[in-house]
Each structure stands twice: as structure tokens, then as C-alpha cells.
């Protein structure tokens, strides 16, 4: 790349959704509503699982971690975007940009790995039901989640640290609403070969592990279900995996959509819309997917809300 006019970045300009003030106001209301729904939905899932002993099982343990990852994944970018729209100040500091890259990559990778772990959990539940509690013991569940966290943090840290070696040109505009790593690399004047190698290697390894794990799990699940003679047992087995399969399809479908939109057209607006689907819509829908058709989860949420209402009533009565 060109080496002239290099500088150490102090701040970047997030162009985001360039629109009139009226449209910006509408976007602020829309994104704030989506964020509040996402935050509340995932927080309720976590609280319901923690407060209900009936949900202290491997499946719900992984689900609570997924909800936490989704909550943090969205919180990494959306609050800053809302602040930028509200104040009309679209600048982000260099340190803030690196922080966004690190946490966005960490929680995105964690989402990916947790979905793979949950696919393995469903495989054991359907294909080895009699040995489920022995195989999916608390020690293994803890190690799977801890391993997912470690891989996510280490991979993200490596990608973020490679950005520190870069010098940037005078053009500091990012055509996005957050510090997307690939967009930041495009602004660098110094050589980004090492950065690209790290990104594509990490993405490739993670993609192969996740795709292989999920594909193998559901390959075995489908063949196990087809061998079941009872229609009722078949339906129960399918319903056990339905929510997870829906979330997997939504997660990878929107992620693949972001990639295709970036590769097919240079339009930043198309990429922005695809990124909103990936960073906001998917985490917002996950709590609904896991709770609407899950009787145990709906009961736990009902008990949680009942206790909250009762507690609020006691406080109100005490103050009056």
C-alpha cells in the first residue's frame, strides 16, 4: 500500500446511516426499541434459567450463556450508534474503535462456538438419551463453555493486537455504524498482509470447526429420528432440536448475507442493512424462538414475572 501521509490514528468518523434529521429521528426510535427488546428478552431468559431449578440442565445452561453473549454482542455496538445519532457526533476514539473490534469479534465468535456446543448437546440428547446425564455432566458442560470463552477471547485478542502495528492514512472515514475490522484495515497505509492472514486463518478454522460440528450432529440426529417408529417420539425429537436449528439458520443465514452483500456490490448502504440484520435482528429474535414453543421456558418466565409483580406490589404497599 502507499506509505505517504501516514499517521497514528486519534479517532475515526463513523458515517453510519447518512440521512436527513427526520429520518435519523425515526432510525433512533427504531434502533432504540430493537435494543430494548433485545436487552430485556435476553436478560429475562438468563434470569428465568437462573431462578428456576427445573431449568438447571445442560441445554438451558448453554442457552443462558448464549443469551448473555447475544446481549453483550449487541451492547458492543448499538449504544454507541444511538449516542452518535442523538448527538450528531459520529467520531469514535482510536481506543474506542479497538475496544469495539475486540468485544464484537469476541462475542460473535462465542455465539458461533456456543451454537456448535448446543448442537452437540442435542445430538447426545436424541442419539444417546439413556446416557445423556452421564455424558453431559456438569464438568464437561463447564469445560465446553470455558473452552468457548478462551478460544473467542484469544482469537479476538490476536486480531485486535495486529491492528496496533498499522499506520493510517489521512482518510479516517468508516462507512459503517461501528468499527468493522475489515473496514478499518481498508484505511491503513501500512501493509495489512499479516492482518488478512490472521483474519482468514481464524475465520477458516472457526468456520470448519463449527460447520463440521453442527453438520455432523444434525446428520446423526436426522438418521436417529428416521429410525424411530413412533410418530409421537419423532415429533418430540424434532421439537427438541427445532428451536436450536432455527437459531442456527438465522445466525449463519444473516452472517452469510453480510458476506454476500459485501462481495456482490460495493454499496455501503446494502452492507449496512445486512449488518443490522446480523448485529441487531438475530439477537432480538433468539429469545422469542427459544421461549414461544418451549413450555418449560414459558412457565419459568411466568413464575419470574409473577414474583417480580408481587415484589413490586409489596414495595408499593410499604411506601404508601
From Swiss-Prot:
The protein, known as: Olfactory receptor 7C1
One Pfam short name: 7tm_4
Topological domains, Extracellular: 1-25, 76-99, 161-197, 259-271
Gene: OR7C1
Glycan-linked positions: 5
Predominant localisation class: membrane
Disulfide linkage: 97-189
Location(s) in or outside the cell: Cell membrane
Keywords assigned: Cell membrane, Disulfide bond, G-protein coupled receptor, Glycoprotein, Membrane, Olfaction, Receptor, Sensory transduction, Transducer, Transmembrane, Transmembrane helix
Organism: Homo sapiens
Domain of life of the native organism: Eukaryota
SUPFAM superfamilies named among the record's database cross-references: Family A G protein-coupled receptor-like
Entry GO MF terms: G protein-coupled receptor activity; olfactory receptor activity
GO cellular component, one term: plasma membrane
